[in-house]
Amino acid sequence: MIPAINYWAVIAATLSTMVVGAVWYSKGVMGTRWMKLTGVQPEGKPAIAIVVPLLVTLLVSFITSWALAWVVGMITIPGHSAPELDNAEIVATFVAPIDRFAFFGTALVAGIILWAGFTAARFITHDAFEGRPVKLTVLNVVHELVTIVVLSIVIGVWPPALA
């Protein structure tokens, strides 16, 4: 069962991840440190060298935003977590109001739990095996936390229009 998803919120959350990344990796914030730790030097590279990673980031950010909206919808929208509903309950699902505070709180908590259990855990595992500097791992994991928190806030303040 697919819960109601506010695709405008998903698009806004996707764009928010791009803004967070642009600020985080700017030279005045963490960009210089990140370039030093990774050895990446963007100067002199063709434009396509940045376009492809940005397009990939946009796509996976959309997937992440949609996935969080789906999880939060399954948890908070009445009826979406119980597939054995009868017809009357299904109808009630579509007219039942969404508790906006619960939706927001669930979005934030779910985002942080999913970040810790999937994003941070996987980053740390891969970086440990690849021998990446701990400072780089921390920089990237904290960036992902900030990104997920902002994304979760956007999803959380803009629930589906079932209310």
Residue map of PLM features:
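Juxtamembrane/disordered regions of integral membrane proteins
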Residues: 1-163
